[in-house]
C-alpha cells in the first residue's frame, strides 16, 4: 500500500465503495480522541445496506482513499442529513474534508427542492463544530440524544 500523502492541491472526489475497496475504506480511522464522535466505517456501510435513504461514498484525494461520507436523503422533501463524515487521522488538516464537504453541499443543492442539510455533533474537545460553522451551519437548539443538531439552509432567503 502506498503511504504517500497526497498534496493539499489533490483533487478530491467521492467514489462508490466497491468489493475491491471496502476493506481499505473500513480500515480508515479517526484519531483516538475522535472515536466517540463517529462510528467506524464498517458499521456505517452495514447500516447503509439496511436504509433506503442512505447514500455513501469513499472520499479520495487523487487516487488515495482518505475518508468516508454517508448521507440520509429524502430528495422528494428536499431534506438531507449528513449521517457520517470522517477523514482518516493521518489525512486530517490538509483540506480534504473541506473539499469533500463542498462536494456534498453541491450534491444536495442540485435538487431544486433542497431546503436544508442537517448534521449532528457531540460538543466536546476535538469536535468539528467550528469546521461546520465555517460552512454556514448553525445550531438549531435541538438534540438527538447527546448530539447537537446543526443546519445549513440550502435555499437563499
Where are the model-predicted features located?
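Conserved active-site alpha-helix within GNAT-family acetyltransferase domains
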Residues: 98, 123-141
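Conserved GNAT acetyl-CoA-binding A-motif
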Residues: 108-120
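Acetyl-CoA-dependent GNAT
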Residues: 7-83, 88-90, 101, 106-107, ...
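Terminal substrate-recognition subdomain of acyl/acetyltransferases
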Residues: 2-5, 148-157
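Active-site acidic-Proline motif in GNAT/NAT acetyltransferases
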Residues: 88-90, 94, 123-124
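Conserved beta-strand-loop-alpha-helix junction that forms the acyl-donor binding cleft
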Residues: 118-129, 145-147, 155
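Short glycine-rich hinge loops at helix-strand junctions in the catalytic core
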Residues: 95, 112-113, 136
Amino acid at each position: 500500500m502506498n503511504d504517500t500523502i497526497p498534496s493539499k492541491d489533490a483533487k478530491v472526489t467521492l467514489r462508490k465503495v466497491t468489493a475491491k475497496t471496502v476493506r481499505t475504506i473500513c480500515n480508515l480511522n479517526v484519531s483516538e480522541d475522535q472515536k466517540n464522535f463517529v462510528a467506524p466505517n464498517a458499521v456505517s456501510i452495514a447500516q447503509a445496506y439496511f436504509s433506503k435513504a442512505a447514500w455513501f461514498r469513499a472520499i479520495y484525494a487523487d487516487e488515495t482513499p482518505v475518508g468516508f461520507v454517508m448521507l440520509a436523503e429524502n430528495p422528494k422533501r428536499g431534506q438531507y442529513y449528513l449521517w457520517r463524515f470522517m477523514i482518516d487521522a493521518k489525512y486530517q488538516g490538509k483540506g480534504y474534508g473541506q473539499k469533500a464537504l463542498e462536494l456534498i453541499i453541491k450534491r444536495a443543492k442540485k435538487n431544486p427542492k433542497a431546503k436544508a442539510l442537517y448534521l449532528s455533533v457531540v460538543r466536546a474537545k476535538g469536535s468539528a463544530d467550528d469546521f461546520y460553522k465555517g460552512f454556514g451551519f448553525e445550531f438549531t437548539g435541538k438534540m438527538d440524544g447527546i448530539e447537537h443538531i446543526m443546519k445549513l439552509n440550502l435555499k437563499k432567503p
